[in-house]
Every structure is written in C-alpha cells, then in structure tokens.
Amino acid sequence: PTTLDELSLSGATNIYAKISNYMRQPDMYEIRVLGVALTDVDNNTARHKRNKKALADTVLAQYICKTEIRHSKNIASAANAAVPVTIALPTSNPSVDYNALTAELLARIEADKEAE
C-alpha cells in the first residue's frame, strides 16, 4: 500500500527495483508482486491526478490495483480504537474499499494459480 504523493512514488519505485533484483534470481527466491494499492486517495485534487498519471508512467503501472482506499477520518478513528476499520465501521467508505481490494487481490491470486 502507498499514498499517492511525490515521496511515495519515488519510494515505491525504489522498493520495486530491489524486489525485481530478487525476481531475477528464481533459483534462490520465489517472489512476485501482487499489486500496488493506493491508500488515502482524494480524487478531487489536481495533485492526486498528477501523481496518478506519474505512477502510470512507471514500471509499477502494470501492478496498480483498480480499487483505491479513499481518504477518510474513519480510518484514524478506527486506528485510535485499535480496531480495523472493517470491523469498527463496516459500512464506511474505507471498509467498502478494503473489502473490494481484498476481493481484487484474491482474484489476482486465483488468476496467477490458473496461469501456472
């Protein structure tokens, strides 16, 4: 998961570079990238749109999840209560988003299994 700001874009790209080094050594490591999930998303800002376009122009573009976790104060409230937002506020936007992301990632896992 990553927020969509300039530092996160750089950091995610650097992390992927390190992971890809391991991916090129299949005899020693079995590692794959399942996806890049965007969190704390606010689609209404020019900054978000600019950074999303920048991310789409990176090597990570193929891994970007369709589901995004929307910005919400409910996430902080649940964290302060030490309870996952999906349990604390199951009908909130973040809960809906996290459940959709889970379904998307499970579908990717199944697709990978079928492709093997």
Regions found by a protein language model. Give the residues of each.
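C-terminal boundary of histidine-terminating zinc-finger modules
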Residues: 78-97
